[in-house]
Amino acid sequence: MTKFVFVTGGVVSSLGKGIASGALAAILESRGLKVTLIKLDPYINVDPGTMSPLQHGEVFVTDDGAETDLDLGHYERFIETRMRKANNFTTGQIYQSVLDKERRGDYLGKTVQVIPHITNEIQDFIKRGARYDTPDAVDVAIVEIGGTVGDIESLPFLEAVRQMSLRMGPNNSAFVHLSYVPWIAAAGELKTKPTQHTAKQLREIGIQADVLLCRADRPIPTEERDKISLFSNVPAWGVISMWDVDTIYKVPRMLHEQGLDGLICDKLRLHTPPANLKRWDDLVYATEHPQTEVSIAMVGKYVDLSDSYKSLNEALRHAGMKNHAKVVITYVDSETLTPDTVSSLAQFDGILVPGGFGVRGVEGKICAARFARENKIPYLGICLGMQVATIEFARHVAGLKDANSTEFDPLTPHPVIALITEWKDADGTIKTRHAKSDLGGTMRLGAQSSDVSPNSLAHSIYGDVVTERHRHRYEANVNYLDTLRKSGLVISALTQREHLTEIVELPQDVHPWFVGVQFHPEFKSTPWDGHPLFNAYIAATLEQRSALSQAKKAETAKPLKVVAST
């Protein structure tokens, strides 16, 4: 039977519940347990698909096409289990499901209430995510509850897991509570009072924490931990310090050395081999001992919040580790780039243009793509980054003046990027949409396969077939592909079903490394293997850096021209 660990947070949000949950899952997985993670989000949105990245961070996409919280990206980077739609749900989904049942008459005329109908539905969703009572059920499901204790929005979720724990019995569930222990510079000490209060709030709704993870900017001394233990009713060995580190991949070792996994296994009566964290130690060593460095300009429109590109940042760092290089990412606001300012990108070893929506900042991205093409700087365009590269090529190489996407200019004379109105989803279901369709859930989503052209750069990276995750509405217009091909653009991958453009590139005798992809490869990158596309991209930037360095040395070594004096 599946055991459950419920992870809650207090005092403030953004403490790192997702990192803590993923790290705990990684340690338990290293003990030989089958683990999954589930994220409960208390907002009323059905999913984060229509939320601003500047407010919510990136939207992480699963293989089965779910638009989910960015924490699911952390989960996939910490453990082997792949996430599904069932691993993330929101208040909006819960209420939508309950109201659908009410309309069908499933409640047989009863008054539908938060307790028991909403709380029961939450429990059913949790069990579904854990595959509870099924042949492929996991050993441990770690359930992260978004928000903080005391928020009105979180109360139904907290009540649901309280009931669930009561029904399952004390040895089948555990509660881990994250709290903030601030350092007050003026007083020169850590303050434990906020943690005492949040533990009390948790008890007031019927939940006693088994473990307190105390977040701070430094390790918390024993004296403060003993004080927290006394006032929170948690044994001293259950008060664990979780301090700031320079890489999240140090967190599993940090928590293991303080005995967190042992505490959880004892509470849940799980008998397992000791944890083996060698792979994490090796990973941290690789992170801390790069042999070289490479600089990447990420030209985006959501650069004010780095979490908007969380998986992309991690994918670049993973590729850096595979190439024994430190990747230094500089965020460039695409709205600041014009033909007069784009030369500022010359200082970087590579240019990357990520995905995005809407017309704001698009011309700056087009400038970046042109600068990379004309100056032979390694370029990787993802989703919108592929589309702007196609638009730029159409305008300045193929001679299609004012070429554009109908997303940005519905009246463009050359819509080289346009809205596709019918396609098959990841599960084969035929979907339709038009310009006035709802924004939520109307994109091409999830994993889909494409055939890769032989003798292409893409083929050297992926082989014959590429399967990647998608999240977009607009596609390269098939009516312009022949024109673009004749002008020198290589269409190196097409979807197997609709033959839509998936990868474009420039021949390597024209440009050393120029690739645009319609999908989102960053969602499948892992710290162990990186991702073949990002690995190749960073390798190309390193080659470019080395070639420029050698050319500069050769230029410096030239003998001085002697001018005869008169």
UniProtKB/Swiss-Prot annotation:
CC per GO annotation: cytosol
Binding site for CTP: S13, D151, I152, E153, K191, T192, K193, P194, T195, Q196, K227
Limits of the Glutamine amidotransferase type-1 domain: 295-547
Positions of Mg(2+) binding: D71, E144
Binding site for L-glutamine: G356, L384, G385, M386, Q387, E407, R473
Gene3D superfamilies: 3.40.50.880, P-loop containing nucleotide triphosphate hydrolases (3.40.50.300)
One Pfam family linked to the record: GATase
Binding site for ATP: S14, L15, G16, K17, G18, I19, D71
Catalytic activity of the protein: UTP + L-glutamine + ATP + H2O = CTP + L-glutamate + ADP + phosphate + 2 H(+); L-glutamine + H2O = L-glutamate + NH4(+); UTP + NH4(+) + ATP = CTP + ADP + phosphate + 2 H(+)
EC number: 6.3.4.2
InterPro entries on file: Class_I_gatase-like (IPR029062), CTP_synthase (IPR004468), CTP_synthase_N (IPR017456), GATASE (IPR017926), GATase1_CTP_Synthase (IPR033828), P-loop_NTPase (IPR027417)
Binding site for UTP: S13, K191, T192, K193, P194, T195, Q196, K227
Gene Ontology terms: biological process: 'de novo' CTP biosynthetic process; pyrimidine nucleobase biosynthetic process
Subunit annotation: Homotetramer.
More about this protein: CTPSs have evolved a hybrid strategy for distinguishing between UTP and CTP. The overlapping regions of the product feedback inhibitory and substrate sites recognize a common feature in both compounds, the triphosphate moiety. To differentiate isosteric substrate and product pyrimidine rings, an additional pocket far from the expected kinase/ligase catalytic site, specifically recognizes the cytosine and ribose portions of the product inhibitor.
Job description of the protein: Catalyzes the ATP-dependent amination of UTP to CTP with either L-glutamine or ammonia as the source of nitrogen. Regulates intracellular CTP levels through interactions with the four ribonucleotide triphosphates.
Entry's family note: Belongs to the CTP synthase family.
Protein name (Swiss-Prot/TrEMBL): CTP synthase
Organism: Polaromonas naphthalenivorans (strain CJ2)
Name of the gene: pyrG
